[in-house]
Amino acid sequence: MTNAKMTFAVQFSERYINKYIGSPIDDLMVSMAGTTQSYQMRLKRSKDSRAMLTTGWNQLIDAKAFDEGDVCLFHFKEVDDVLVLKVHVLK
C-alpha cells in the first residue's frame, strides 16, 4: 500500500491536535492498545487545518492491526507536553 494516510476532521484537529504540531509537520508515537507495538508516524497539518497521520500509517495497515469494518478509537493524550496516540480497535 502506498501513501496511506489517516485524516481527522477540521474542527477536531483545531481543538485537540494542531497545537501540538510544530510547523506543518511533526513526529508522533502511535501505539496499539493491547499490544507492545509502537509506530513512529508523521503528523501533518494540511492547508485547511486538518491533522493527518502520514508517514508510518502504512506500517499499521501492513501489520494488519485492523480489518475493513473494524471501528478504531483514537485516544490522544499529552505526556510531558508531548502528544501521543493510542489506537484501540473494536472488532
Swiss-Prot record:
Residues 1-91 bind DNA. It comes from the Eukaryota. InterPro entries: B3_DNA-bd, DNA-bd_pseudobarrel_sf. Coiled coil: none annotated. It is found in: Nucleus. One of its GO terms (molecular function) is DNA binding. Its main location: nucleus. GO terms for cellular component: nucleus. Keywords: DNA-binding, Nucleus, Transcription, Transcription regulation. It holds the Pfam family B3. This is B3 domain-containing protein Os03g0164300. It comes from Oryza sativa subsp. japonica (Rice).
